[in-house]
């Protein structure tokens, strides 16, 4: 297979598993990410590279020159690179706007310059804000509550706009819901709880613990990414990617972590009732959100 795929943010959690699947399937893959990200995960990336064709390219999506070099010869771009984290992005709104909007524009422009055939944009379930109904399907109105969500809505519109002006650039938009799996950093709640349980510490839940989610495993989610890449029926469409079953409150999920990871330890879920010390912002918290993947 000679299809060349560029994955921006390829050294990230979803990026690494996406790259693994594509390399194993015979694609010629280029992982484009910040130098510190690639270096942090170089052992995993080297192991993936031993399975097939993988090129590592250091660069920022704010650097047009490095983007243009990376895009040379590309057939498909999967654009995962973004500034993440509610508190981080709310504390640095201008930085978030620059990376997630200007950066996406740069990636799209480089893709057009090199005649890329398909652009897959990684959006987020955050674009739905606090939904009117659950489960959420793709036709529901977008109404993001955070600057991160607004930048993802803008990225979706940029992607559609480029397709209008350059019809040869097909696109698909993916709205990722909560994802978990091996290799996820501990700033994310499930990974943090697992680490706490292994260390004999109680999982801590901020707020009342009744926030409701459904988590998809990264293996399933990235299988969806590959199917979107490979099927032209996805062109011009938007898809939710996540788990539409196993809906849990955060209290229930934390208890399940204890039972699965450390049943022999005398642990209990600590529900704090507020957000003091959390990386979440109370007025930005989404209470119930899970996806309809039908």
Where are these regions (language model features)?
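N-terminal Rossmann/SDR dinucleotide-binding element
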Residues: 1-76
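Residue-level signal for the nucleotide or nucleotide-sugar donor/cofactor binding architecture
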Residues: 62, 91, 99-102, 139, ...
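Conserved sequence/active-site signature of Rossmann-fold short-chain dehydrogenase/reductase
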Residues: 62, 127-128, 179-181, 221, ...
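Conserved NAD(P)H cofactor-binding loop of Rossmann-fold oxidoreductase domains
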Residues: 81-84, 123
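Catalytic helix-loop patch of NAD(P)-dependent Rossmann-fold dehydrogenases
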Residues: 91-94, 98-106, 113, 117-118, ...
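C-terminal substrate-binding subdomain of Rossmann-fold SDR/epimerase-dehydratase oxidoreductases
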Residues: 197-294
């Amino acid at each position: 297979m000679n299809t060349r795929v560029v994955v921006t943010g390829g050294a990230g959690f979803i990026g690494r598993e996406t790259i693994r699947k594509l390399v194993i399937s015979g694609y010629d893959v280029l992982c484009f990410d910040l130098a510190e990200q690639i270096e942090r995960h170089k052992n995993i990336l080297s192991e993936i590279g031993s399975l097939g064709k993988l090129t590592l390219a250091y660069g920022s999506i704010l650097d047009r020159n490095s983007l243009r070099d990376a895009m040379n010869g590309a057939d498909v771009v999967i654009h995962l690179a973004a500034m993440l984290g509610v508190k981080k992005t709310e504390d640095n709104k201008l930085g978030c706007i620059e990376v997630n909007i200007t950066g996406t524009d740069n990636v799209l422009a480089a893709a057009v310059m090199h005649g890329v055939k398909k652009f897959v944009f990684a959006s987020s379930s955050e674009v739905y804000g606090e939904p009117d109904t659950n489960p959420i399907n793709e036709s529901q109105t977008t109404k993001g509550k955070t600057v991160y969500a607004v930048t993802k809505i803008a990225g979706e519109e940029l992607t559609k706009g480029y397709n209008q002006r350059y019809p040869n650039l097909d696109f698909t938009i993916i709205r990722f819901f909560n994802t978990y799996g091996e290799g996820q950093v501990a700033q994310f709640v499930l990974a943090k709880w697992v680490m706490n349980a292994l260390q004999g510490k109680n999982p801590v839940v901020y707020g009342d613990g009744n926030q409701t989610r459904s988590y998809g495993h990264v293996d399933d989610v990235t299988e969806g990414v590959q199917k979107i890449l490979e099927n032209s029926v996805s062109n011009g469409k938007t898809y939710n990617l996540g788990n539409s079953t196993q809906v849990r409150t955060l209290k229930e999920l934390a208890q399940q972590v204890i039972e699965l990871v450390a049943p022999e330890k005398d642990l209990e879920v600590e529900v704090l009732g507020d957000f003091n010390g959390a990386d979440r912002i109370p007025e930005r918290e989404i209470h119930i959100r899970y996806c309809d993947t039908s």
